[in-house]
Amino acid sequence: IPQENRREFFELYDAMENELMVLDTETRQLERDMRRDTTAGDMQLESALTAIYSQKLKEGEIEMRYARELKRVLTPRQLLQLKDAERRFNRTLMRQHRRMRSANNSSPRR
């Protein structure tokens, strides 16, 4: 990323990540609330499920909106490389998480 575009890139990218994090936090809170609420009726649960399953759509909408803005500071190739880097990073994190969980489950307990 050229030096003159870095600041704008990070401002946009951080704003996008913050929006995605808020959405994820709200969705996880809704899931917890519905699990704990033993009095919730089917209508409430259906409404919550719709919101939970809609999270991916909302994430996509946020990413598309920011992709349009990021095109001002990144080339299409750079945007593609960014998406690839995000995917590889997440895959690496998941592998490490699975390895750690597997190691913890196989260690002897006292």
Regions found by a protein language model. Name each.
Residues 1-73:
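Amphipathic alpha-helical segments
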Residues 10, 60-110:
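Amphipathic, charged alpha-helical segments and their helix-to-coil junctions
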